[in-house]
């Protein structure tokens, strides 16, 4: 799930955290809403015999959703933290999973589509990762990517999650072009909730030793349901052609050129 600076520090997730994450992410409004957007952009890119690889697949939450919708696609996933992979394998037994560093991807011209979802922000050498993904894609292959957005949203939560950065749209688009991609589609999401997100991230700093990496998923059920409804409305706007300029996250689709 989360690579990069964690590879250097050993911080962030521990083995027991992945078990908790696997239990909670299915009910989280944020994970469910992100999955719906990923499905929406990925389905037109994946014919029945296509190959898809998720870089930083974590517990397999995204791949499992894609595989349910597109059972004939050949799925695989890579993950830096081997403790997460048993959960991914149990969710999608038909997929191939590899313990791997995103900065050193051994595949060459292997996949029709690569996805990486809230992974790149953890990696200091993000340009290296994009270049490795470019090599792993077939000619004219597609990359679907999500990242946290807006440096002004930086807070102790980013530090505790071992983020290296939050992106601007121009920064990510520029890095994709430098790596050899053309950008086909961008939109912000978690846009309607951005004011609430901003206010929630203002409290005083919390010591890293007190960090619970899955605490944000333990929302009051009523609050979680209300936020899920807002995200559903937002997704409808995006499907109708609205491209939000601001939002907690950024979704991009790019093509290998």
Task: Label the predicted regions.
Residues 117-120, 146:
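Residues lining the SAM
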Residues 196-228:
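C-terminal helical/coil "lid" or tail adjacent to the Rossmann-like core of SAM-dependent
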Residues 181-191:
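Conserved S-adenosyl-L-methionine
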Residues 1-117, 128-130, 217-221, 237, ...:
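Conserved N-terminal segment of class I S-adenosyl-L-methionine
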Residues 200, 204, 245-257:
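Core SAM-dependent methyltransferase catalytic element
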Residues 127-142:
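A short glycine-rich, Lys/Arg-flanked "PGG" loop and its adjoining helix->strand segment in the class I
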Residues 22-24, 143-165, 169-174:
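Short, glycine-/aromatic-enriched active-site segment of Class I SAM-dependent methyltransferases
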């Amino acid at each position: 799930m989360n690579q990069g600076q964690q590879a250097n520090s050993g911080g962030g997730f521990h083995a027991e955290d992945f078990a908790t994450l696997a239990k909670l992410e299915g009910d989280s409004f944020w994970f469910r809403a992100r999955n719906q957007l990923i499905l929406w952009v990925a389905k037109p890119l994946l014919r029945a015999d296509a190959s898809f690889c998720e870089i930083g697949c974590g517990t397999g939450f995204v791949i499992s959703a894609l595989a349910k919708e597109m059972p004939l696609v050949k799925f695989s996933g890579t993950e830096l933290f081997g403790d997460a992979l048993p959960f991914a394998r149990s969710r999608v037994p038909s997929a191939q999973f590899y313990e791997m560093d995103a900065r050193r991807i051994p595949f060459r011209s292997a996949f029709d589509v690569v996805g990486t979802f809230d992974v790149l922000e953890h990696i200091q050498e993000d340009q290296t990762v994009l270049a490795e993904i470019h090599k792993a894609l077939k000619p004219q292959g597609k990359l679907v990517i999500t990242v946290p957005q807006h440096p002004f949203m930086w807070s102790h939560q980013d530090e505790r999650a071992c983020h290296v950065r939050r992106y601007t749209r121009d920064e990510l688009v520029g890095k994709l072009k430098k790596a050899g991609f053309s950008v086909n589609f961008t939109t912000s999401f978690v846009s309607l909730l951005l004011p609430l997100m901003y206010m929630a991230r203002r409290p005083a700093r919390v010591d890293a030793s007190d960090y619970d990496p899955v605490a944000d998923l333990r929302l009051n059920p009523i609050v979680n349901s209300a936020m899920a409804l807002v995200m559903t409305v937002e997704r409808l706007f995006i499907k109708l052609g609205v491209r939000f300029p601001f939002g907690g996250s950024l979704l991009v689709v790019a093509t290998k050129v």
